[in-house]
Amino acid sequence: MGAESLIKSNDEDIGELNDIVGFHIRLAHGAVYRHFSETFADLDLTQKQVSVLWLVDDRPGIAQIELGRRLRMDRATTMTIVNRLQDRGFLRRERSATDGRKQALFLTPAGNKALDKAKHAIREHEDWLKDRFTPEEIDKLVEMLTRIHE
């Protein structure tokens, strides 16, 4: 087991699973996702939908293809999310002024309102998460997680 495992389950002995990094990442992901879902239940928005609204707000007129690339989503997923947000009146599409083949995305007033509510919920969710760590640990955690997903 190497250096005695520093992380012990309070509920029960999980044996060698305790030494599997991926197992702990899965447990952490589950806890974060559950809290996110509870925090966002009244907004009826998914994590990906909020990410799309936020990026479109940060970059008005962003091309749908560029949006998907930046959020690391395939074309089909991007189109499905954009379609749903447009159907709900949160986004509008326009032909790109620079390239008529591309769709430029913009938030509608309803999209701005939904994003404002989502940002409030995200602050609540982030506070819940960050309360478990020091500022230095947060920086290190983000750096380590980035190594995994990049």
Task: State what each model feature region is.
Residues 1-17, 135-150:
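C-terminal regulatory/oligomerization modules of transcriptional regulators
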Residues 4, 33, 61, 83-143:
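Charged, amphipathic alpha-helical coiled-coil/dimerization segments
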Residues 23, 38, 54-55, 113, ...:
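Surface-exposed charged/polar residues within alpha-helices that form helix-capping/stabilizing sites
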